[in-house]
């Protein structure tokens, strides 16, 4: 149950470093882990900042039942959960896979509406996630060719299965969340999200963000970074750093 193990690992890291407390900053999956760690060990993690993924309560049902699917299409989490399916698609042409996902989840795609290509939306049955995504003619300014090549080499060595296995344990993590029911984030918190983040296209996500003070009563800010997408700290590093530094100085 990674939901329990990873915060425990962070606690162990503090012990190994000889530190009594730390401030956590997490992005995407790391944001979920940072929220969880601050929730269960506020004595060790005295503040938390999260990028992209807001603090949210436990869903009323398991993700496999919650996320949409029908005869024509299924939500990307279902597609990722099918063993071997996404791996086969993504590993067929790793450079193209990364170009498409990085570009189409970025702020370059503009506002997230029903017609915006989204790597993290509905996937046609019998088709692939990459089919509808734009392959850019040039890399966005925040993604250098050398950086992309390092990612290509890393995924060529490892494949995509390790990351995709996260989605295959969503129901397990949901079950583990029951142990933390009723716990709030009692330490100071900060939330940052890109104006064009793909997650904002998920139904109900904006309402979840608006309701965060109920779960994190010491939320010091919920900031939307203009024109940035899912890769927030890469697309808008100056804005992210400024927000983090201001948050840390006020603790």
Name the predicted role of every residue range.
Residues 1-25, 29-220:
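Flexible "cap/lid" subdomain of the alpha/beta-hydrolase fold that forms the substrate-access gate
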Residues 217-251:
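Catalytic active-site module of serine/aspartate enzymes centered on a nucleophile-bearing elbow/loop
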